Regions:
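Histidine-centered active-site loop/cap adjacent to the catalytic His
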Residues: 100, 292-317
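Membrane-embedded segments
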Residues: 59, 63-145
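Short extracytoplasmic
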Residues: 41-68
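Hydrophobic membrane-insertion alpha-helices, especially the h-region
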Residues: 6-27
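Secreted/periplasmic serine-hydrolase-like ester/acetyl group-modifying domain
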Residues: 114, 123-231, 237
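Well-ordered, non-membrane alpha-helical segments in soluble/globular domains
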Residues: 94, 211-219, 254-265, 306-309
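Alpha-helical transmembrane signal-anchor/signal-peptide segments
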Residues: 25-45
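Substrate-gating cap/lid alpha-helix
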Residues: 242-279
Length: 317
């Protein structure tokens, strides 16, 4: 029996060593062992909120995920915590708002991202239930393949001396190299990353229809916010003209949004007690899309996002 235990102990040594490395290098700071993390993943941000529940939160997809929180605070005079993450659907954002309301009874304010893209009924990702299970169960995190791959990537970058977090959504575009299609030689009027973006989102937008069930759920959550004294602001972030002219107008989305959806949203805002800030259709910022947009949905984090940050958060004072 003693020999068996010794053999088992020896077998467990490499496993224990691996998980020690995992704890040291996992980039999401799940266990709170690191002072800071630059991870923008959903698990990282939700776990940080569990450890320190802020009174003002930002909920949305990637267009609201890259704010400089110091600049947010300067413009609004308030302290914010971001829970926004890439690819978040309207359902996931509703789930997240419900979760925040449950987690923090002292919540004061929430910014909620919405757009024609997340309103699309076919864009209905559903990951919040899995996230909640992972938040509650450390072993689910430890044995999750994706998070282990993330750790190994972070470890590899550390060993190579590569700065974690990547280069960000920004570019100093050079003509003609960054304006030319490498396959056809065609020269675009805007930089290539922006020029090809409409084609990337076009397939998902072809059968566009409003997700009325999730929109009604948002209104119910707005009622809960109003009853609890939580200020809710629904924000439609700006998009580039290329998306408007090459996707929204040809597919009839623009007409539906401006003629039906937005008037209904304004009525709902009055009825359910939330504020509505529309930078996607009504108050489109006069940005130079070639320099201030990284792609069709995302403002350049150096040349466009800071300007919109000041506009948005000044409106939230």
């Amino acid at each position: 029996m003693r020999n068996i235990l010794k053999k088992l102990a020896l077998l467990l040594v490499p496993v224990a060593a691996y998980f020690a490395v995992f704890l040291a290098f996992e980039p999401n700071n799940y266990f709170g062992l690191h002072k800071v993390t630059d991870s923008e993943s959903s698990i990282s941000r939700l776990k940080a909120f569990q450890r320190e529940k802020g009174s003002r939160v930002i909920i949305g997809d990637s267009r609201l995920a890259h704010f400089d929180l110091d600049l947010d605070g300067q413009a609004s005079g308030k302290t914010w915590q971001t829970l926004a993450f890439g690819g978040a659907s309207l359902k996931e954002n509703n789930d997240l708002l419900a979760w925040v309301l449950k987690e923090n009874p002292d919540l004061q304010e929430a910014v909620f991202g919405l757009s024609f893209y997340t309103l699309n009924k076919s864009y209905n990702a559903d990951r919040m239930a899995t996230l909640e299970k992972t938040l509650a169960n450390p072993f689910a995190y430890l044995f999750n393949l994706e998070y282990n791959v993330n750790m190994l990537t972070a470890l590899s970058e550390r060993l190579q001396g590569v700065q974690s977090g990547g280069a960000g959504e920004t570019g100093d575009w050079q003509y003609p190299a960054d304006y030319t299609d490498p396959d056809t030689g065609a020269v675009y009027p805007v930089h290539r990353t922006l020029a090809v973006y409409p084609q990337a989102i076009l397939p998902r937008c072809r059968d566009w229809a409003v997700n009325t069930a999730q929109l009604e759920r948002l209104y119910a959550l707005a009622d809960e916010c109003a009853a609890r004294g939580v200020k809710l602001t629904v924000v439609l972030p700006p998009m580039a003209d290329t998306v408007l002219t090459q996707v929204c107008e040809p597919l009839g989305i623009a007409g539906e949004m401006t003629g039906t959806v937005l008037p209904a949203l304004r009525e709902a805002a009055d009825a359910h007690g939330f504020a509505l800030l529309d930078y996607e259709w009504t108050d489109r910022p006069a940005y130079d899309e070639d320099t201030q947009f990284y792609d069709g949905f995302h403002l350049d984090t150096r040349y466009g996002l800071p300007q919109w940050t000041e506009t948005l958060f000044a409106a939230l004072r």
